Amino acid sequence: MSSTAAFCLLSTLGGYLVTSFLLLKYPALLHQRKKQRFLSRHISHRGGAGENLENTMAAFQHAVTIGTDMLELDCHITKDEQVVVSHDANLKRSTGVNVNVSDLKYCELPPYLCKLDVPFQRACKCEGKDTRIPLLKEVFEAFPETPINIDIKVNNNVLIKKVSELVKQYKREHLTVWGNANSEIVDKCYKENSDIPILFSLQRVLLILGLFFTGLLPFVPIREQFFEIPMPSIILKLKEPHTISKGHKFLIWLSDTLLMRKALFDHLTARGIQVYVWVLNEEYEYKRAFDLGATGVMTDYPTKLKDFLNNFSA
């Protein structure tokens, strides 16, 4: 390679790196900042599954009463095409009955068990008296001013259409987020109703990471408005230490190192994209997420997070 060619190559690379860094810090130079219809720091996972039975009206009411900024919930569709709030497609874990939501009419759904495991807290259970599986429209009616984050749990066109219709019926486009880790579901949601903001699918999260570490992210337009990701390190507390191999521990460490990046969070935030980290249940986890620049935290313990935020200065 001649010295002239080498100089041109280095100049081009240098220009690219400088431009990438500049746009990473100041994305408004290239992209119009997305309008934020609401801002959520305190997000109650399944309504707060550590303080009330998950995805119940009692859980949602408790979370709203203490001042949560957002309810996170999961949706399935019944045999008679009713949109219900339930995390699992099969109800064995939550009700003790080995049956699929889609195989029963709404009136046939069994009640939740009176005691359920807290999903992201090892060896912890939550008890409650409200064991009824609610309809999504009940949640919309009860909390008309509360932002709601909807996980569309199955790739079902009728479910997606019904949820969209309910959002429009209750005029909640400005207070709703929807999607799933599955990119096909997210694409269908966006196609069905582009007025409802969508979250990043797993495939898109991985793409964003690839673009970030190659310096290309500042140049790429983004349609999603909510970057919702786990904190990989919490996996270590959910399992018995002796059950985690060294290889698994390394993968957890690597995932955490790649995903928990303040520069990434700050860039997305500057573009009007909210960053939510899930599902965190300890104060040191809350602090780490907010110190990294997360917009909000999803928790099973809304009271604990509320107390933390009352004393936390970002």
UniProtKB/Swiss-Prot annotation:
InterPro entries assigned: GDPD-Related (IPR052271), GP_PDE_dom (IPR030395), PLC-like_Pdiesterase_TIM-brl (IPR017946)
Q: GO cellular component terms? A: endoplasmic reticulum; endoplasmic reticulum membrane; membrane; perinuclear region of cytoplasm
Provide this UniProt record's keywords sorted from A to Z.
Answer: Cytoplasm, Endoplasmic reticulum, Hydrolase, Lipid metabolism, Membrane, Metal-binding, Transmembrane, Transmembrane helix
Tell me the GO molecular function terms.
lysophospholipase activity; metal ion binding; phosphoric diester hydrolase activity
Residues bound to a divalent metal cation are E72, D74, H87
Please list the residue ranges that the record places on the Cytoplasmic side of the membrane.
25-195
EC number(s) from the headed UniProt entry: 3.1.4.-
Where would you find this protein in the cell? Cytoplasm; Membrane; Cytoplasm, Perinuclear region; Endoplasmic reticulum
Tissue specificity, please?
Answer: Widely expressed.
Q: How does activity depend on pH?
A: Optimum pH is 7.4.
Write out the transmembrane intervals.
4-24, 196-216
Give an example GO biological process: N-acylethanolamine metabolic process
Write out the topological domains of type Extracellular: 1-3, 217-314
What is the top EC class of this enzyme, as a single word? hydrolase
Superkingdom classification of source: Eukaryota
Induction profile: Up-regulated in white adipose tissue of obese mice.
Q: What Pfam families does the annotation carry?
A: GDPD
What is the role of the protein in this entry?
Hydrolyzes lysoglycerophospholipids to produce lysophosphatidic acid (LPA) and the corresponding amines. Shows a preference for 1-O-alkyl-sn-glycero-3-phosphocholine (lyso-PAF), lysophosphatidylethanolamine (lyso-PE) and lysophosphatidylcholine (lyso-PC). May be involved in bioactive N-acylethanolamine biosynthesis from both N-acyl-lysoplasmenylethanolamin (N-acyl-lysoPlsEt) and N-acyl-lysophosphatidylethanolamin (N-acyl-lysoPE). In addition, hydrolyzes glycerophospho-N-acylethanolamine to N-acylethanolamine.
Q: Which family does it belong to?
A: Belongs to the glycerophosphoryl diester phosphodiesterase family.
By what name is this protein known? Lysophospholipase D GDPD1
Query: Organism source for this protein?
Result: Mus musculus
